[in-house]
């Protein structure tokens, strides 16, 4: 069974002189694991989530929304062992759907 790892972040790291780093401020506010073969949805993201880190162990297709359904070859694609960051709207009850 394929796995999508989701890490939710509310803030980015702020470095010296107020410079924003391109990494999430640890600890994350939530983490999810979604197992899938056909289209499967995550739970709704935390209301404070601003961006998510996605990592998959297999080639997959994904889409975001309040009630998303991922479709092979038409939704966004992640390659096996790829890690990706995506911004999401605050307080939108967004989820990610994923399929092989």
PLM regions and their residue ranges:
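Short linear motifs in intrinsically disordered
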Residues: 43, 53-54
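Short, solvent-exposed S/T- and G/P-enriched segments that are highly enriched in secreted/extracellular
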Residues: 36-41, 72-89
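Short, surface-exposed beta-strand/strand-loop-strand elements in extracellular ectodomains
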Residues: 55-73
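Short tyrosine-centred short linear motifs in exposed loops/low-complexity segments
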Residues: 38, 60, 92-94
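Short, intrinsically disordered N-terminal pre-domain segments
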Residues: 1-28, 99-100
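Surface-exposed ligand/attachment interfaces on beta-rich extracellular proteins
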Residues: 18-48
């Amino acid at each position: 069974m394929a796995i999508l790892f989701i890490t939710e972040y509310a803030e980015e790291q702020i470095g010296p002189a107020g410079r924003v780093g391109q990494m999430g401020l640890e600890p994350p506010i939530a983490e999810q694991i979604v197992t899938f073969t056909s289209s499967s949805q995550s739970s709704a993201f935390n209301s404070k989530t601003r961006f998510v880190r996605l990592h998959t162990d297999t080639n997959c297709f994904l889409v975001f929304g309040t009630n998303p359904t991922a479709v092979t070859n038409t939704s966004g694609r992640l390659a096996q062992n790829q890690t990706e960051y995506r911004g999401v709207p605050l307080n939108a009850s967004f989820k990610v759907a994923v399929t092989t």
